[in-house]
Amino acid sequence: MTSHTHPASVTYSNHIKRLIEVYENAINIISTNSSGPSSHIESVLIHSGCEGHYFGDDRGIPFQAYGHFSHWLPINQPYQFLHIRAGEKPVYFQIIPSDFWYEQNIDLPDWCSEQFQLVTLTAANQLPQHLQGKGIAYLGEPTELLNSLGLSEDMLNPPALLHYLDFNRAYKNEYELEQLRAANKLAVAGHSAARECFLKGGNEFQIHMAYLNACEILENECPYTNIVALDEKSAILHYQHKRRGSGANSRVLLIDAGCRVNGYSSDVTRTSVRPGVNPLFQQLLIKMEQLENDLVSLVKPNINYTELHTYTLWAIAELLIDLRICRSNAADLLEREIPQLFMPHGVGHLLGVQVHDVGGHQADHNGAIMLPPAHSPALRNTRELSQSMVFTIEPGFYFIPLLLEPERNGDRAELFDWTLIDELYSCGGVRIEDNICVTSSGAENLTRQFEAGS
């Protein structure tokens, strides 16, 4: 298949054209509205990042390229550089060391490489002799090269430039949506295999391996550490272990796991139960599935993401009353911030080349910040929804002893049915998460479209 017939050839070309336009607009706006060194930016040099090692060891830490580099190139290698100049083809400085210890070749498909002027070097210290002109802004992890490049600290990750670029990362073009759909399709296959393993009595380690095998990925190729939690461990929001003990008696699985395709990440969570689970928890799972679907149906342009979070807290307050986990009424529980004890996280976040993508609290490209409400400081997204914006929707409901036990002898103790809560601690919690793109009139669910029966 030639580059011109590859499915990504046209959309990737348009993606690069769009990025060039964004960067040129950023430079023009900054030069007009800023003072100091930032007003003299003429081009941008992006560094993929440095290779790290564990302290006192020569073993390398798994590398993750800088997000603004990954936005341009699907290359996850350290010491790569991209130079963007107004009106010219971007230059990709491909650093390939002469090395017999490790594989250093970079497999760049034709449909990708043809968008760049490619300059191959054997070491990053050869870079300065190939850079011409002044006013170079540097984005990424600092290196010793900065001195030889003659860049001032004011041109290192200039805030005005980052504000503009971070804000625009929320909006995805067709190439980006193609990668996100592919990443979701892979993740859905992995989740299906994980659920099947769980239903057969698999333990956390076996479920984790079933996911990796179905997706045909290595652990360090995951966009984040897979959360594979059985029973009470599902109340630990970012549970990181994979227990190898028997899973035969487990009743609840919460798995939060994604995939990465050409740098773009999916972030999908499913909760499953086995026969014998607490009937009330089974009811809770059904109602949380419905809540997640309801939230997706509310997505449309020109509403604020915070509204979705507020709706979620109200729905959880109603669930607490309906399931008789709490007493009083939903309005009272909401006023007294009881739902936050059962869902202490936000209802989602922006998604792209980073799982928790940048710019979630920005009001505009100048860097003005919209803080989350005081009652929900963990909310990662406060943006107004616009067409082509991609984020997660992930309501959760957990029985977390660390949050609930202080209430047992506190001023609000009478609100809780402690007998029920004690019974439900062993079930852990529920989280349901899909990846969503805002359309002109509603939403595309990038995840559910790949599930059988959806």
Locate the predicted segments by residue.
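Active-site neighborhoods and metal-handling regions in enzymes and metal-associated proteins
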Residues: 1-454
